[in-house]
A protein has these predicted regions:
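Short, glycine/acidic-enriched loop or turn micro-motifs at the edges of active sites
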Residues: 22, 54-55
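Nucleotide/phosphate-binding catalytic cleft detector across ATP-hydrolyzing
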Residues: 1-47, 66-80, 101-156, 163-190
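Gly/Ser/Thr-rich beta-alpha loop segments that engage phosphate groups in nucleotides
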Residues: 55-56, 162-163
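Short beta-strand scaffold segments in enzyme catalytic cores
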Residues: 57-61
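Long, charge-rich alpha-helical interaction segments
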Residues: 85-96
Length: 190
């Protein structure tokens, strides 16, 4: 690669992998680039990383020495934006509305479990919780086809914006899983 006559970089190898790997790297470093408190542990044991994004869920299994197990890593076309669509449809039917609620109202329902209809608060927590469970099950079914049961993994990390929205539902699937701080920025930081 050159800029004019000056070489900028000599690319020796290029590897394409899932965003989940970048999220793993994020867990290895502090904000200043120094090794995190978890660095030694995470680099010496098998770790699963599940990045629940808007449209896709990426997963990666990293083996000791930070080697990616490509047979257990990949991407699935199921993401947290499906929750907005599902809740919107359920609320429209449940509330007998002619048109769908605005996206902002659906997002509020996901956060608070309630919507305002004709100026009055209505609880929709049961519908939201049912749809969260359904989507988390769908996501985890897809993840298990790659990652497996997770019994052989020392850690499982849930990252991405979906890890915030579906935190409680996702953590039920792997007893040793955790959601790191600010999981929505994990792959960008990594």
């Amino acid at each position: 690669v050159k800029c004019g006559d000056l070489p900028l970089a000599k690319i020796i190898e290029n590897t394409v992998t899932t965003e989940a790997v970048a999220s793993f790297v994020d867990q290895l470093m502090d904000i200043d680039g120094s090794p995190s408190d978890d660095y030694e542990e995470l680099t010496q044991v098998p770790v699963g990383v599940i990045d629940v994004g808007g449209k896709t869920t990426d997963c990666a299994v990293l083996l000791p020495g930070m080697m990616v197990d490509s047979s257990r890593s990949g991407s699935n076309d199921v993401g947290v934006l499906m929750l907005v669509e599902a809740v919107s449809a359920k609320l429209r039917a449940h509330l007998d509305l002619d048109t769908a609620l605005p996206t902002s109202a659906i997002e509020r329902a996901l956060r608070t479990g309630s919507v305002k209809i004709y100026g009055k608060e209505q609880s929709v927590k049961e519908i939201v919780d049912e749809e969260k469970e359904r989507l988390a099950d769908q996501i985890m079914s897809a993840v298990r086809t790659k990652v497996g049961s997770g019994v052989d993994l020392d850690h499982v990390l849930f990252v991405g914006g979906g890890a915030i929205v579906l935190r409680d539902q996702l953590l039920k699937h792997y007893p040793h899983a955790r959601v790191p701080d600010q999981p929505e920025f994990a792959n960008a930081r990594g």
